Amino acid sequence: AHSAMIKGASQVFVVDNHPDRLKLAAQMGATPINSLEKEAVDQILNLTHGKGTDRGCECVGYQCCDRHGHEANHLTMNNLVASTKATGGIGVVGVFVPQDPGAKNELAKEGKMAFDFGAFWFKGQQIRTGQANVKVYNRRLAELIHHGRAKPSQIISHRLKLAEGPDAYKHFDARDDGWTKVVLKPAA
């Protein structure tokens, strides 16, 4: 959300089902969308007067879950196709793997998903994927931080000693309230 605002987005939506994360998104100036209250696509289309967003970003990856907590690796991608306008762009930074032997469905086990390619094609959307090339952005981001225009530290909820790492991972993995991002300090 913060990056989208820095890049000039006039309105940013954050879809989640954890109240603490939605609160943080609102504090950053984004519009929080609670996917447990109502379908996220419907909320976004309503807030954009049926037009959809110019761009969407998939940040969850293959471990996405539906509102009942069941893994559904296709959910965010298909929701983005539905909520992004025709000719809009979709960025995928969430991790997708070539194989997931522990997955519940056969497609997911093969690293595949049921993707709404028909709607994607009909709308003329574009997808970009992969890890960010941080070397391209780090100098500019450092300048933005230095001049007070970017503050990525605002999403950090805990700064802990390295020895506290195992306990921190348990809280983070369990999605305990208030555990958004953790920084482990080896020298502390």
Write out the residue ranges for each language-model feature.
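Glycine-rich cofactor phosphate-binding loops and adjacent beta1-alpha1 units
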Residues: K7, K23, M28-G124
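Rossmann-like dinucleotide-binding domain for NAD(H)/NADP(H)
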Residues: F120-W121, I127-R128, L144
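C-terminal hydrophobic helical "lid"/dimerization subdomain
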Residues: K38, H68, Q131-A188
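Aromatic pocket-lining residues of Rossmann-like dinucleotide-binding sites
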Residues: A4
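Short beta-strand element of Class I
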Residues: S10-F13
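Conserved SAM/SAH-binding beta-strand->alpha-helix loop
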Residues: H18
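Generic secondary-structure boundary/loop-capping signal
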Residues: C57, V92, K112, F117, ...
